[in-house]
């Protein structure tokens, strides 16, 4: 990876500043460090992503604590509830309120977490459409370019359009936020693919499955439990997706 992925050097003063515009609302902060190399040591100022602990409270009960970026919190709550199988969809969520470091959620009825359904879908995607989404994943990852400290997730529509894009310090929360954002916009996830930068573990595959995606793709590696779950559910799972190749571990019939 080229040196400029994280920061651009400026001779005077000795600081790192990213190529991205300085957005005062972005979840990062400047901090000092010492660079040690064959040329010796020097003081630098770099940007780092902000991580905060957010508590998820559902119907008066704390169910989870997430370490994530303190942004897009409604999307996080909606996506988390759907991806964890706690609600069927946004219509089952009565309200989401942010109170300090907590997200207070109310829902209609209850649903068990292991609500997996075998995928029955005729959705198909061309590799070039997927590679185009991966290119956009890199282009839109502005906080990653400033800090090197985030994962990204993108909801890719059947025709190649982008339903949502989110970054987070947590790969799970990036997926939750992308799902929540797409659902709040009324997107039918059964006609979409989840594109992400994180490893495809069973946790991530389970989230994607509960949300209703037939296809999940990552530019990173899969894990065996994630592959096994995708096969059991009839999902398409592809990883190491980097132009001009991707490796399909389950459901290759959906990739044209």
Task: Outline where the language-model segments fall.
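Intrinsically disordered, low-complexity regions enriched in acidic/Ser/Thr/Pro/Gln residues
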Residues: 2-158, 162-165
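Surface-exposed beta-strand edges and their flanking turn/coil or helix-capping segments
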Residues: 69-71, 77-82, 118, 168, ...
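Solvent-exposed, non-transmembrane amphipathic alpha-helical segments
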Residues: 83, 97, 150-157, 180, ...
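Short acidic/polar capping segments at secondary-structure boundaries
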Residues: 110, 161, 170, 200-201, ...
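A general structural motif
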Residues: 137, 141-149, 167-179, 197-199
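Feature captures the catalytic cores and cofactor-binding loops of soluble hydro-lyases/lyases
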Residues: 171-248
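Short, basic/aromatic-enriched C-terminal tail that caps enzymatic domains
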Residues: 246-256
């Amino acid at each position: 990876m080229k040196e400029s992925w994280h920061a651009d050097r400026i001779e005077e003063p000795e600081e790192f500043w990213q190529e991205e515009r300085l957005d005062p609302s972005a979840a990062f902060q400047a901090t000092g460090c010492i660079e040690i190399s064959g040329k010796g040591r020097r003081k630098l100022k770099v940007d780092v992503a902000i991580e905060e602990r957010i508590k998820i409270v559902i119907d008066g009960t704390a169910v989870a604590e997430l370490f994530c970026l303190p942004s897009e919190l409604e999307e996080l709550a909606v996506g988390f509830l759907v991806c964890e199988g706690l609600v069927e969809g946004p219509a089952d969520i009565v309200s989401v309120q942010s109170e300090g470091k907590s997200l207070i959620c109310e829902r209609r009825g209850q649903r068990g977490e292991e609500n997996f359904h075998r995928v029955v879908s005729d959705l198909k995607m061309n590799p070039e459409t997927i590679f185009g989404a991966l290119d956009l994943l890199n282009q839109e990852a502005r906080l990653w370019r400033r800090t090197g400290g985030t994962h990204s997730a993108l909801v890719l529509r059947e025709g190649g359009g982008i339903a949502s894009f989110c970054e987070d310090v947590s790969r799970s929360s990036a997926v939750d936020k992308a799902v929540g954002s797409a659902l709040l916009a009324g997107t039918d996830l059964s006609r979409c693919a989840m594109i992400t930068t994180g490893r495809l573990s069973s946790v991530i595959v389970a989230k994607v499955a509960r949300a209703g995606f037939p296809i999940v793709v990552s530019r990173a590696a899969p894990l065996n439990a994630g592959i096994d779950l995708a096969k059991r559910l009839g999902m398409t799972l592809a990883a190491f997706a980097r132009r001009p190749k991707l490796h399909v571990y389950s459901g290759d019939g959906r990739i044209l």
